[in-house]
UniProtKB/Swiss-Prot annotation:
Name of protein: Crossover junction endodeoxyribonuclease RuvC
Domain of life: Bacteria
Catalytic reactions of this protein: Endonucleolytic cleavage at a junction such as a reciprocal single-stranded crossover between two homologous DNA duplexes (Holliday junction)
Species whose genome carries this gene: Bifidobacterium animalis subsp. lactis (strain AD011)
Annotated stretches, region: Disordered: 174-193
The keyword Nuclease is assigned to this record: yes
Length: 193
């Protein structure tokens, strides 16, 4: 399974491509950053991001596009641009019939390090280790895109399906799956389900 990870951003949109094989074997394929000029109008910047993402999807033909879920930040303009870039990734994938998965930064950290509050350098080191890279992926947007792709490939309902899935989870993945199930049950209780 080929997973294309996207760390959305209006100025720098990270793109990471990995292959998920049997027994949680992940292989690095590609990493890049699609850039737009902050001095251009927002519509032209979004078009550059969209065109760049379309080109990557056409080149690597992923089975899934995994996008970092956008959360509200203090800077409203930043979150707006980030959300719009995420929308461009979703649109490009939908036009190609590619399934989209959204993952939070906490999910990504939990899947990769076993710690939902891991520091950026811990994430970068684990991404390099998981993908057997000789150096840390740079810039940060590129590393984050690879992390989102890895998160999707390693999640319990990602690349591994059925009985094989449970059998090959790492301790960190088991902990993450249990935490996700617990959080889902708690939300259901609060909503009166």
């Amino acid at each position: 399974m080929i997973v294309l990870g996207v760390d959305p951003g209006l100025t720098r949109c990270g793109v990471g491509v990995i292959e998920a094989g049997a027994y949680r074997r992940l292989s690095f394929i590609h990493v890049d950053v699609v850039r737009s000029d902050p001095h251009e109008s927002q519509d032209l910047r979004l078009l550059k991001i969209y065109d760049g993402l379309c080109a990557k999807m056409d080149e690597f033909i992923p089975d899934t596009v995994s996008i970092e879920r956008v959360f509200a930040q203090e800077n409203r303009n930043t979150v707006l641009g980030t959300a719009q870039a995420a929308g461009m990734a979703m649109l490009a994938a939908a036009q190609r019939g590619i399934p989209v998965a959204l993952h939070t930064p906490t999910e990504s950290k939990m899947a990769i390090t076993g710690n939902g509050k891991a520091e950026k350098i811990q994430m970068e080191r684990m991404v390099a280790r998981i993908l057997n890279l000789n150096a840390l992926p740079t810039p940060a947007d590129a590393a984050d895109a690879l992390a989102i792709a890895i998160c999707h490939a390693l999640r319990p309902s990602g690349a591994l399906e059925g009985g094989e899935r449970e059998q090959h989870l790492t301790p960190a993945q088991r902990q993450w799956a249990q935490a996700t199930q617990h959080a889902t049950r708690r939300r259901g209780v609060r909503r009166g389900m």
